[in-house]
Swiss-Prot record:
Gene3D superfamilies: Ribonuclease H-like superfamily/Ribonuclease H. Its EC number is 3.1.21.10. The keyword Hydrolase applies. GO terms for cellular component: cytoplasm; Holliday junction resolvase complex. This is Crossover junction endodeoxyribonuclease RuvC. GO terms for molecular function: crossover junction DNA endonuclease activity; DNA binding; magnesium ion binding. Homodimer which binds Holliday junction (HJ) DNA. The HJ becomes 2-fold symmetrical on binding to RuvC with unstacked arms; it has a different conformation from HJ DNA in complex with RuvA. In the full resolvosome a probable DNA-RuvA(4)-RuvB(12)-RuvC(2) complex forms which resolves the HJ. The active site is at D17, E76, D148. Its main location: cytoplasm. The lineage of its organism: Bacteria, Pseudomonadati, Pseudomonadota, Betaproteobacteria, Nitrosomonadales. The gene is ruvC. The keyword Lipoprotein does not apply. It is an enzyme of class 3 (hydrolase).
């Protein structure tokens, strides 16, 4: 009698934490209920002008996509900063990151920082160090990843778990509010 062995096929997710100076990336693969760390790092743009920085982000993420072949991309949404110019610049970096994914016809999913932190740490207002620590533990890493890479990995983890946490809480809160009205 011959037994067949099937390799478990997971879904590979690229998480992106966009930034004009440093864009973090992290790749995880979800196989069943298990997460496997594939890689992470940062695309650093330097001090060049805006168009060159955006091109560096696009080219860097394009290379990562070609190398690691993710199937889905999870990107952190832009938060509204006190300085509107900073928010607009961050939005442009985010646009370059999303463009890299779209060029490869990948599905792009967006999560707020609160959603990501809630899903990974259990607290939507967690500090950077807490996110780094939980990412390290969840993925079995030997050391904490850099903050930007940790945020990107956290975004990928959030997506791998269906964006649970704040999304579920928000739905519950909406139904409570609608009952009160």
């Amino acid at each position: 009698m011959t037994s067949l062995v099937y390799a478990a096929k997971g879904i590979r997710i690229l998480g992106i934490d966009p930034g004009l100076r440093i864009t973090g990336f992290g790749i995880v693969e979800k196989i069943g209920n298990r997460l496997v760390y594939i890689g992470s790092g940062c695309v650093v743009t330097g001090e060049s002008g805006l168009p060159d920085r955006l091109k560096t982000i696009l080219d860097g993420l394009n290379e990562i996509i070609l190398q690691h072949k993710p199937e889905q991309v999870a990107v952190e949404q832009v938060f509204v900063n006190i300085n509107p110019k900073s928010t607009l610049l961050l939005g442009q970096a985010r646009g370059a990151a999303i463009s890299a994914a779209v060029l490869h016809e990948l599905s792009v999913y967006e999560y707020t920082a609160l959603q990501v932190k809630q899903a990974v740490v259990g607290n939507g207002h967690a500090r950077k160090e807490q996110v780094q620590e939980m990412v390290m533990r969840l993925l079995g890493l030997g050391e904490r990843p850099r903050p930007d890479a940790a945020d990107a990995l956290a975004c990928a983890i959030c997506h791998a778990h269906g964006g649970t946490g704040l999304l579920t809480l928000s739905a519950r809160n909406r139904s409570k509010r609608s009952k009160r009205l």
